[in-house]
């Protein structure tokens, strides 16, 4: 069998006047993530991990932040398109593991919604998708609440 591991990373600044969307879940908060699309840091990290595992480049190669057609894009749509491309290349997803690092807001109440969205978008049972919420223990730009970071790992199997 041909197994492929992919690793993804993303970070966005928190700013006033934007919704906070993580894992496809809109989270009540006074600030949101700055980005060309909806800036869903978690879905961007997972998308990057999927493209990386399939040796298909990264999210920017497929969905450029300089392309006007992706302005304000729903990252769930981008994740589904990534999944279609990875599947067309002959891969299936074994599992997804991810971490979101945010000093605030508390993400634990939203984790199951994130898992459900990701599982639905990738055609997986929810037990094959994991999302962890972490703080940065008040250290650095994440600890000061200046942004939110996500990391993801995926395992692909060639069909």
UniProtKB/Swiss-Prot annotation:
Chain residues that bind a divalent metal cation: 10, 12, 44
Pathway where this protein functions: Isoprenoid biosynthesis; isopentenyl diphosphate biosynthesis via DXP pathway; isopentenyl diphosphate from 1-deoxy-D-xylulose 5-phosphate: step 4/6
HAMAP family cross-referenced by the UniProt entry: IspF (MF_00107)
Primary role: Involved in the biosynthesis of isopentenyl diphosphate (IPP) and dimethylallyl diphosphate (DMAPP), two major building blocks of isoprenoid compounds. Catalyzes the conversion of 4-diphosphocytidyl-2-C-methyl-D-erythritol 2-phosphate (CDP-ME2P) to 2-C-methyl-D-erythritol 2,4-cyclodiphosphate (ME-CPP) with a corresponding release of cytidine 5-monophosphate (CMP).
CDD domains: MECDP_synthase
Cofactor: a divalent metal cation
Subunit text: Homotrimer.
Catalytic reaction equation(s): 4-CDP-2-C-methyl-D-erythritol 2-phosphate = 2-C-methyl-D-erythritol 2,4-cyclic diphosphate + CMP
Gene field: ispF
Protein name listed in UniProt: 2-C-methyl-D-erythritol 2,4-cyclodiphosphate synthase
Alphabetical GO biological process terms: isopentenyl diphosphate biosynthetic process, methylerythritol 4-phosphate pathway; terpenoid biosynthetic process
EC numbers, comma separated: 4.6.1.12
Keywords in alphabetical order: Isoprene biosynthesis, Lyase, Metal-binding
Record site feature (Transition state stabilizer), residues: 36, 135
Pfam family, one: YgbB
Natural source organism: Paraburkholderia xenovorans (strain LB400)
Gene Ontology molecular function: any one: metal ion binding
